[in-house]
Curated annotation (Swiss-Prot):
Native organism: Campylobacter curvus (strain 525.92)
Organism domain of life: Bacteria
Positions of disulphide bridges: none
HAMAP family: PanC (MF_00158)
Name of this protein: Pantothenate synthetase
Length: 273
């Protein structure tokens, strides 16, 4: 496996890699959720690239940019074990110079939920991803459903800009107790981890209500909020797969999302129904 630190090194690798390139963009601190993306990428492409870059432009002032988990040595070992062809591990100076953002997330997506709570976040995500997509020339890009709003926004960008790649959505990976895997779980104390399970339990309860015939979104959200007590809830939302608010669950076309603070850590989770 090659370790690439500069844009030039990546460009030289890509130039000789052929057309069957798969790409997994990450911010490092890789866990089993990332591994599921990486393994799928490796199995479906002749050449696989994983980036680990903590992108500063998607963090708001006061967020956890400086303390975001960094585990480069562990990340490299994981990628080697998965059979990755090359890792791209740039620093911020390599990715950004005096350029201004030229890609802006549509207000339809960026003004609600995560976008409302973290204004400018999705602009920063698209800013780095369009660079990485162009650099890797990937045919397929693998992204997790856990960041559902991000996934839909990226799919929209790919469609709008006529980018010649396929965004491959990958299922959420959970601990045995139901907690969705996240690099930010490293911030949680044992007590926090117990409280964090309220997110997945709220989603499971919502799923059970739907299976029982309840399709009214206000009733489902009321039940979820009770399960989430006493957490500080940012939002509970039920939308269609283009992130339009809906009053009735549309089976096969609905995402149920939750964001809440657990201790000092903000967590998100969702299910697709």
């Amino acid at each position: 496996m090659l370790i690439l630190k500069t844009v030039k090194q990546l460009q030289e690798f890509v130039a000789s890699a052929g057309d069957e390139i798969g790409f997994v963009p990450t911010m490092g601190a890789l866990h089993d959720g990332h591994m599921s993306l990486i393994k799928k990428c490796v199995s479906e492409n002749a050449v696989s690239i994983v980036s680990t870059f903590v992108n500063p432009t998607q963090f708001l002032p006061g967020e956890d940019l400086e303390k975001y988990p960094k585990k480069e040595e562990s990340d490299i070992k994981i990628c080697e074990l998965c059979g990755v062809s090359a890792m791209f591990i740039p620093d911020a100076k390599e990715m950004y110079f005096d350029d201004e953002p030229c890609i802006i997330a549509p207000k339809k997506y960026s003004s609600i939920l995560e976008g409302k709570s973290r204004p400018g976040h999705f602009d920063g995500v698209l800013r780095v991803l369009v660079k990485l997509f162009n650099l890797t020339r990937a045919k397929r890009v693998y992204m997790g459903k856990k960041d559902a709003q991000q996934l839909v926004i990226v799919q929209n960008m790919v469609k709008t800009l006529f980018l010649n790649l396929q965004v491959v959505p990958c299922e959420i990976v959970r601990e045995s107790d139901g907690l969705a895997l996240s690099s930010r779980n490293a911030y949680l104390s044992e007590e926090d981890k117990c409280n964090a399970l309220r997110l997945s339990r709220a989603l499971i309860n919502a799923s059970n209500l739907i299976k029982g015939g309840e399709l009214d979104t206000s009733e489902i959200k009321t039940g979820m909020l009770k399960t989430l007590e006493p957490l500080t809830v940012d939002y509970v939302a039920i939308v269609d797969r283009d992130f339009n608010q809906i009053s009735k669950v549309e089976l096969g076309n609905t995402i149920i999302l939750v964001a809440a603070n657990v201790g000092k850590t903000r967590l998100i989770d969702n299910i697709w129904v």
